[in-house]
């Protein structure tokens, strides 16, 4: 029994030690910005790659390169869909092919599912989401979903098809923990938590994120 308790204690401490803090960013950022964020203790960055206007973010390639040059080990990008553009199968490939053209070094593409720009028809929203997934899969992207219960349910209703992909959820309670998480959309376990917004210590705006390893 004592060995078992020691093992559990070790796992708990090891998990805490190996948790990661990071940022998500929606504006151009320099090497100095990322070096500052590393000095603040952040270890990963998720950078906007596609805007809700239906265009690739012109800053994404440079920001990814600057993050890598600064020494950020884990760099992803996120895609903010444009529902009114009506071309879900094309949006993911537009981003991925753009990044590939510049040999951008990144990991995942997170679909940002939020805002009031979606249709009031949940069936149409689900079809659009599935089009986004299909487009990203056609170019071999590693896909994740950013959302929250308060955003997902009004947009997608009871749809659970997104739950096969990792979940990055938002709850600005300021706590680096998944203890607040309640299942929704078919997800029972999240991958990343966005736990606060409003960071600006390094001259660039960012949100605070966390995940255990």
From Swiss-Prot:
One term of GO molecular function: lysozyme activity
Record localization: Secreted
Domain Ch-type lysozyme: 21-213
Keywords carried by this UniProt record: Antimicrobial, Bacteriolytic enzyme, Glycosidase, Hydrolase, Secreted, Signal
Annotated active site: 24, 112, 114
Leading EC class: hydrolase
Primary localization class, coarse: secreted
GO biological process, one term: peptidoglycan catabolic process
Highest taxon of source: Eukaryota
Catalytic activity: Hydrolysis of (1->4)-beta-linkages between N-acetylmuramic acid and N-acetyl-D-glucosamine residues in a peptidoglycan and between N-acetyl-D-glucosamine residues in chitodextrins
Record has Transit peptide as a keyword: no
Known EC number: 3.2.1.17
Cellular component aspect of the GO annotation: extracellular region
Gene3D superfamilies hit by this protein: Glycosidases
Signal peptide: 1-19
Family: Belongs to the glycosyl hydrolase 25 family.
Protein name in the entry: Probable GH family 25 lysozyme 4
Organism: Dictyostelium discoideum
